[in-house]
Every structure is written in structure tokens, then in C-alpha cells.
A protein has these predicted regions:
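Short, well-ordered alpha-helices that flank and scaffold nucleotide-derived cofactor binding pockets
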Residues: 19, 23, 67, 94, ...
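Short acidic active-site motifs
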Residues: 38-42, 61
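Short, surface-exposed alpha-helical segments at coil->helix boundaries
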Residues: 15-19, 59-66
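Ser/Thr/Gly-rich flexible loops in soluble cytosolic domains mediating phosphotransfer, phosphorylation
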Residues: 3, 75-104
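Short acidic/histidine-rich motifs immediately flanking catalytic phosphotransfer sites
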Residues: 46-52
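Conserved active-site segments centered on acidic
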Residues: 2-39
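A short, gly/pro- and small-residue-rich
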Residues: 61-81
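Short glycine-rich anion-binding loops that position phosphate/pyrophosphate groups of nucleotides
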Residues: 10, 57-59
Length: 104
């Protein structure tokens, strides 16, 4: 199962994107767990996931969050702003899967 965490300022804004990513995974019969959290929950949640994607609101925290996740070999990367804004769940899912593949 692929475990993907989305992180934004409060954990609420990516909920539609999570749904679209799950739908895209179902179309391909991919087993996924995709959850969204606020950045305040990052430290407690990220070890459970294979990749963390950051929403545009918290992209400025990339360096700090990446450094926290690096010892566990968990990639942390920002979501493409256009894909986020247009809610392109399939593109974001593809990006997450490529990061997981590159890290493992």
C-alpha cells in the first residue's frame, strides 16, 4: 500500500484533492492511504507515510520539514501550484508515486 501525506496550514484545504487522488488510484487499482494534516501535526504524523507533499501555503517550510524527514528517508516536496489549484488528483498522485519510487 502506498502511504501519502498531504500537509497544509490547517489540513482542511487539500481534502478535495485527497478525494481526487483516491479516485485516480481506484481507477488504476492502486492500494493507497492518502491523508491531509495541518503542519502543526507534521512531527507526529510523517513517520507513518512514504512521502509528504506540501500545499502552497506551507511550501516555505520545505527545508525545515525535509530535514526532519531525511533520517527516515521520507521525501518531502511541494505540490505543483497549478496541479493543486486545478485539483488534478491524477497528476499529484503520479508525482507522489514517482517520489516514493525514487526514495526506495
Amino acid at each position: 500500500m502506498y502511504k501519502i501525506m498531504l500537509c497544509c496550514s490547517a489540513g482542511m484545504s487539500p481534502s478535495l484533492l485527497v478525494r481526487k487522488m483516491v479516485d485516480a488510484a481506484k481507477e488504476r487499482d492502486l492500494p493507497v492511504q492518502i491523508d491531509a494534516y495541518g503542519v502543526a501535526e507534521f512531527d507526529m504524523q510523517f513517520p507513518q507515510y512514504q512521502v509528504v507533499l506540501l500545499g502552497p501555503q506551507v511550501k516555505y517550510m520545505l527545508k525545515m520539514l525535509s530535514e526532519k524527514a531525511a533520517p527516515l528517508n521520507i521525501p518531502v516536496q511541494p505540490i505543483d501550484t497549478m496541479d493543486y489549484g486545478m485539483q488534478r488528483g491524477d497528476n499529484v498522485l503520479n508525482y507522489a508515486l514517482s517520489l516514493i519510487a525514487a526514495a526506495h
